[in-house]
Amino acid sequence: MELIFQNVWFVPLFPFLASILLGIGLFFFPNSIKKFRRLSSFISIMFLNIAMLLSFHFFWQQITGSPIHRYLWSWVLYKNFVLEIGYLLDPLTSIMLVLVTTVAVMVMIYSDSYMFYDEGYIKFFCYLSLFTASMLGLVLSPNLIQVYIFWELVGMCSYLLIGFWFTRPSAANACQKAFVTNRIGDFGLLLGILGFYWITGSFDFQQLSKRFFELLSYNQINLVFATLCALFLFLGPVAKSAQFPLHIWLPDAMEGPTPISALIHAATMVAAGIFLVARMFPLFQMLPFVMSIISWTGAITALLGATIALAQKDLKKGLAYSTMSQLGYMMLALGIGSYKAGLFHLITHAYSKALLFLGSGSVIHSMEPIVGYHPNKSQNMIFMGGLRQYMPITAITFLFGTLSLCGIPPFACFWSKDEILVNSWLHFPILGSIAFFTAGLTAFYMFRIYFLTFEGDFRGHFFDDVKKLSSISIWGSLEFNKEQFKLDKKSTLYPKEANNIMLFPLIILTIPTVFIGFIGILFDENKMNVDSLSYWLTLSINSFNYSNSEKFLEFLFNAIPSVSIAFFGILIAFYLYGPNFSFLKKEKKKLQLKSEIDIVLKSFSNFIYNWSYYRAYIDGFYSSFFIKGLRFLIKIVSFIDRWIIDGIINGIGIFSFFGGESLKYIEGGRISSYLFFIIFCMFLFFLYSYII
């Protein structure tokens, strides 16, 4: 058994080997390997399945009482400086290993069909395997330096995958935007790592917290400097997990293939920031100001993401802002000290959002032959509608993911989100109010997405009639006269259900979307009076002082407010976007008669629409203030460099040149001329002196 634990590094090694094999094949045999497309995906999936089985084995060993395993090797030795690499296996690590590998396997199986006809099919699996290996290496890292190395590898793979279709300008711009934004966070992370090494003399997670606590106990730490280092370190997770104000890259990252959105932007890369904050949680707890910044950053991000998602027309971008909002919930939980609730929501959200993204990919895949392959058409919810009758399995699984994200029992996200809501209210009512209000918005925009996509009448055949489609408001007025659209008789294309290879991951992911939430709930009293997840996390290196878990019935009773708010949001979405039953039509006509109310609602809806369309005006502000301001500053610097600095140097050179040319004619080589010149100058000097 000990031999198996000494070889934990096999988990990231297998997907890394798959990436290396496909990369070598593409480099040396580019034409031959394209004939073995299925074999390439089989290698990637098989190797990742081995890593997944190993992850489940390590997870089972950890939760059944196996001690924490930590293996280190000396990497750099210089005098008293020792830099070690290795791996750390505790319950938190094992949970993340299972999470990453299970979602990655489902995404790879799904991609086998989704990307099969793409020219970069093998390259896609090569990048995907490398990304998975990098994320697994990050999870296993025992110190900050190793985390930083894999952190950068994850960022590099994200850049490659977001810009996978780089010939499309929007995709090329999106991957550059993600890269530059994350560089800001990564620079802060590096400064924070170096700062804490300056304070404690260690990069190791366990030693770092222990030494920091000892120094803090003896008042040997400058709290201002320590707080500054912690905020710099927190800047890395802010960028990686798309927290305000470095969230702007996430919606544009939807330009990548949809399976990438399910893997990177649901369960892995964006979760890396949450994981790092959880790893550094014992240290952050000693700095109350930093914890306050973390909690408020999470709350603002949750609310901002929800408000921007309210009127999105792009299916994937709506889910992207939803991801941003839910990541804000996780950060809020960690900031208020609710360690278990934050990680609990990380787990439940990962499976639910992966299901939603893969479901959106199935929808987009079926819409592309009808409306075209450009994202502005195939991902536009205005051209969808009524897909439930054509894609019933996709619709049901998407509905399950929607119900989970809205916090409806007994789906997974209900248990974790409600715990965050209650804890945030108890910690500080203002934070709790923001969290509860955001929960209502989440229910509204998620069912808005569902109704626009799967309910009503199919609108895909009207995509080329711009004038008539412009009359279809995205704010609920989706009734239109079918007779006013004259369909071409040749137009017989309708969406089709995805094939079995794409449906298999959707069905499998439905299982954790429904049941994974039960790991955080106490159904019957045990000796420790604690739920399974809390017990597992107490065995981790980041053990925390948990309070007794609420009993099942008590938990449900406390969840009544959050569920009520969620149902209220669903009812509003149903009223605006749901099937147009006769009684709803009558109610809408009654409201239309009240002109004052109608004007107020219309002005409010226009404000919300503009807020969502212009992304809360944040992107425009960054573009005007930073990008245009930086370009203007560069022009000024360029002008100074060219005309002042270079002008002085060039002026001296020109003056020397013409001075030399002038003296060239005076110097004739005759001594009599030199004597005459000297005497003449002396005469002028004495004459000047005499006059003065």
UniProtKB/Swiss-Prot annotation:
GO cellular component, as recorded:
chloroplast thylakoid membrane
Q: Which UniProt keywords apply?
A: Chloroplast, Membrane, NAD, NADP, Plastid, Plastoquinone, Quinone, Thylakoid, Translocase, Transmembrane, Transmembrane helix, Transport
Topology relative to the membrane, per the entry?
A: Multi-pass membrane protein
- Its domain of life reads Eukaryota
Q: Which Pfam families match?
A: Proton_antipo_C (PF01010), Proton_antipo_M (PF00361), Proton_antipo_N (PF00662)
Asked if the keyword Thylakoid belongs to this entry, the reply reads yes
Similarity comment text for this entry:
Belongs to the complex I subunit 5 family.
Q: What is this protein called?
A: NAD(P)H-quinone oxidoreductase subunit 5, chloroplastic
Q: Which organism is it from?
A: Marchantia polymorpha (Common liverwort)
